[in-house]
């Protein structure tokens, strides 16, 4: 799994400037993780439980595995992205997502509100874009696993809807691998982090993750 919009919070007895915290944290983090900004918040702000919405992308790449995109996408055969997009619309709205949650999920309720499901193609890349108020454990990877079955012609839109209504996790089959998963945005009430989160520069729907945009550009040459 990858993240371009992760927000975390922590409690500390130490006093440092925001820039000192950012530089200090980055000096101890592995090269694959970077802190972009730091802000002081009130005591009633836990980053996880204050969030009002989250957005994930899942990226499949058709054809043979690309060594330059290794661990950043999930390789697959040819997909019908239009069929995947159409099938995904049955997930929009508030539903019982028992069929799409992992057995180890500890959420007290299986109900979640999905705001949009979009599937778009960028050359060999097929991107699934889902926004919701919250996600159950492995819910996004299970959505990707179900939609790829539609894309391969193994399922129709009706089959996904029937699985959702039937609330049977076993019907969906395999969970998609973590490689193609990206957390791209976390939403908060306006009074939290208003000066840090630039909503006008939000992630455009269905956009390809930055680390894959160069691959798409090369394919179009």
Residue ranges and their predicted role:
Residues 1-221:
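Structured-RNA-binding interfaces characteristic of tRNA pseudouridine synthases
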């Amino acid at each position: 799994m990858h993240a371009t919009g992760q927000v975390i919070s922590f409690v500390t007895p130490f006093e440092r400037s925001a820039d000192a915290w950012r530089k200090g944290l980055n000096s101890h983090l592995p090269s694959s993780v970077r802190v972009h900004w730091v802000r002081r918040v009130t005591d009633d702000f836990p980053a996880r439980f204050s969030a009002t919405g989250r957005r994930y992308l899942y990226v499949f790449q058709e054809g043979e595995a690309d060594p330059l995109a290794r661990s950043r996408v999930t390789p697959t055969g040819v997909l019908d992205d239009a069929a995947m997009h159409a099938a995904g619309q049955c997930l929009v709205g508030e539903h019982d997502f028992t069929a799409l949650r992992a057995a180890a999920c500890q959420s007290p309720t299986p109900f979640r509100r999905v705001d949009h499901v979009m599937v778009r193609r960028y050359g060999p890349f097929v991107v699934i874009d889902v926004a919701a108020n919250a996600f159950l454990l492995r819910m996004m990877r299970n959505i990707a696993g179900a939609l790829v079955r539609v894309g391969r012609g193994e399922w129709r839109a009706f089959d996904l809807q029937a699985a959702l209504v039937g609330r049977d996790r076993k019907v969906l089959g395999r969970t998609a691998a973590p490689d193609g998963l990206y957390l791209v945005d976390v939403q908060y009430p306006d009074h939290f982090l208003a000066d840090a989160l630039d909503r006008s520069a939000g992630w455009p729907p269905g956009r390809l993750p930055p680390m894959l945009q160069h691959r798409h550009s090369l394919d179009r040459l």
